[in-house]
From Swiss-Prot:
This is F-actin-capping protein subunit beta. One of its GO terms (cellular component) is sarcomere. The gene is CAPZB. Keywords: Acetylation, Actin capping, Actin-binding, Cytoplasm, Cytoskeleton. InterPro entries: CapZ_alpha/beta, CapZ_alpha/beta_2, CAPZB.
Amino acid sequence: RLPPQQIEKSPWSNKYDPPLEDGAMPSARGCWDSIHVVEVQEKSGSGTMNLGGSLTRQMEKDETVSDCSPHIANIGRLVEDMENKIRSTLNEIYFGK
């Protein structure tokens, strides 16, 4: 078996070269997985606090694919819409307290 650096996957055919039996393949329906990381920097004079949490949102949407609205543009709009909703929710939680 070749090291990962010597295996390539074509963006056009979605096939590995050389062929790889257990290579990851995207869903036929298409999906987007995103993780947002927030860094908090401690300031002097601040109290001590432990904060943790998890936020999961899921959206499903049917879109048409055409030359003027390709698949990647539809995914981009979906990601931006979801990001705006999450930012709004966090803003309401933060300023609502």
